Amino acid sequence: PGRPDRPALVPPVDVPHRSPFTAEGLAALLHAVCHIEFNAINLALDAVWRFAGMPADYYRDWLRVAAEEATHFGLLHTHLQSLGYHYGDFPAHDGLWEMCVKTQHDITARMALVPRTLEARGLDATPPMQARLRKVGTPVALRAVEILDVILRDEIGHVAVGNRWYGWLCAQQSIEPLSHYRRLAREHSAPRLKPPFN
């Protein structure tokens, strides 16, 4: 997958936190979600390209996920452009892609730690983000809430795809899924999931 020159990629602690109650802060928030969706497109396509020998349904599932992630990116980027900004105008971090690199040689780890951990965290983070945007209350913020509704609905399906293929892979290898997940999370330094949980 291609990587554009922008946005500038910085450590997560160096991504500035801005209030969504300002125009620039709202744009920065939209940009952050746009960056997640951009990476999600590449992650889904990498899952198709990198791992040979899976059932045909696996490839169909991840191509559908990639198409939905591209739709999300398009919705967010169009909204960002309506504010006078473009993808790449704010710095971003590369946590999602770093996990892709860490799991590039192990499809079971990929299914465990990208859709079932990082994408699942998005399910937890979206409702509080929407609540903040509702407090902003501007038409721009409320449109962002609507876009996040679409994303949240689709991401539930993406996590389910990851669960399906993680379970299938564990069954093929006679691995107990829960204990193996904990081992993979430790081995790959996956982020610990924090409440609130959705």
What does each of the following model-derived ranges do?
Residues P1-N198:
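Non-heme di-metal
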